[in-house]
Curated annotation (Swiss-Prot):
Known function: Required for stress adaptation, morphogenesis and virulence.
Residues with the 4-aspartylphosphate modification: 142
InterPro entries: Bact_response_regulator (IPR050595), CheY-like_superfamily (IPR011006), Sig_transdc_resp-reg_receiver (IPR001789)
Gene3D superfamilies, per database record: 3.40.50.2300
GO terms under biological process: filamentous growth of a population of unicellular organisms in response to biotic stimulus; phosphorelay signal transduction system; positive regulation of filamentous growth of a population of unicellular organisms in response to biotic stimulus
CDD domains the record matches: REC_hyHK_CKI1_RcsC-like
Protein name in the entry: Stress response regulator protein 1
Keywords: Phosphoprotein
Response regulatory domain boundaries: 90-209
Keyword Phosphoprotein: yes
Superkingdom of origin: Eukaryota
Length: 218
């Protein structure tokens, strides 16, 4: 069991409240984040049978109900008290660690069963890939990657007229105050700390809220 003080990190510098708040209050408490007790099994499992790999890209196209029987999804804390979002979102995941990509893909497919998820291990190919494919609804970025870091990618995306409104979520071990301030400066919308062991409902609320805020800006 992780510490109850472990929370998802926004790019804002939070002061946790004196008393824990429920996830229903999650986005109504501006400037604060809830304390969460989490215990999620994130051991790597078998790669889903419907994935196919070419060069550094793995695409997950089919709904989660086509997962092979031996593929397990992370355990939720308590009852499964969330309703999956059935939107056909397109998510791009960027991390030089393939295990981290598989873990995050598995979680997102549980929350968004009809999502189209693409994994990229090579951060140098991200901008060219974004320019050559249909638009994505959100990009999940590792920060510490060789050659091109997540912060540099975020900065370049925000400088692009075609990509500047693309929702960006960081998933990283670097979550000190100065790190979060830098992520905010380069335009990252939200930051999750690693290990990525948050209750499903919290992840769903965060991603939905980030997407909704960006859509409202259009």
């Amino acid at each position: 069991m992780n510490s109850p003080d472990q929370i998802p990190f926004n790019t804002q510098l939070y002061t946790p409240p004196a008393q824990p708040i429920t996830s229903t209050d999650y986005f109504s408490k501006k400037g604060n984040a809830p304390k969460l007790a989490v215990d999620v099994d994130l051991e790597p499992r078998t790669v889903p049978s419907f994935s196919h790999r070419h060069t550094e890209v793995t695409k997950y196209i089919s709904p989660v109900d086509k997962l092979s029987p031996d593929v397990e999804t992370p355990a939720e804390v308590g009852p499964a008290n969330f309703i999956p979002n059935m939107s056909q979102y397109r998510f791009l995941l960027v991390d030089d660690n393939s295990i981290n990509l598989k873990i995050l893909t598995k979680i997102l497919l549980r929350l968004y069963p009809r999502a189209h998820i693409v994994e990229l291990c090579d951060s140098t190919s991200v901008l060219a890939y974004l320019a050559s494919t249909p638009p994505f609804d959100c990009v999940f970025l590792d920060i510490e990657m060789p050659v091109v870091s997540g912060t540099e990618l975020a900065y370049r995306i925000r400088q692009s007229p075609k990509l500047c409104r693309l929702p960006l979520i960081a998933v990283t071990t670097r979550t000190q105050e100065e790190d979060l301030a830098q992520y905010k400066d380069v335009g990252i919308d939200w930051t999750f700390g690693k290990p990525f062991n948050y209750p499903y409902r919290v992840v769903l609320d965060v991603v939905d809220n980030v997407l909704r805020q960006r859509i409202n800006e259009l």
